[in-house]
């Protein structure tokens, strides 16, 4: 399960490591796949295995590079919810690189403390909460598309915020192919 930092490169896994690996698989809902080769699971399950490997390290911070890339909607939601539980249940901090600004709103909508650092041309454009940073002007600079920030009030204490591109061909110029 990738705990060689604790066990050494050539030593056999200890019972403690096996228990930690099982616990990590349980945390991401994949105990049923514990004995299946990695090459025989889906992309979404593979992402969850990678998250389980990170959890097994027992570190306070986990770095994730586009953890929902190439996933279908169902597995994207499973990965995002798993990340929410990692923060809430384990007190972890997650540093995540993503090209999807709505992921930050997703975590903010779940009540998590979220900080966003927007980068443009290898410079930090702005750092702050999703509501401060992910605005229409910044999205236009970053992606070259017009968008609108939609806020929907669910009840007196809960809002959902999401950036929506304007038009079906948002960002595609006349004569360009999608």
Stretches with model-predicted labels:
Residues 98-99:
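H-loop/switch region of ABC-family ATPase nucleotide-binding domains
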Residues 62-66:
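Catalytic Walker B motif of ABC-type/P-loop ATPase nucleotide-binding domains
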Residues 11, 37-41, 45:
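Conserved ABC ATPase signature
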Residues 13, 129-178:
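ABC ATPase nucleotide-binding domains
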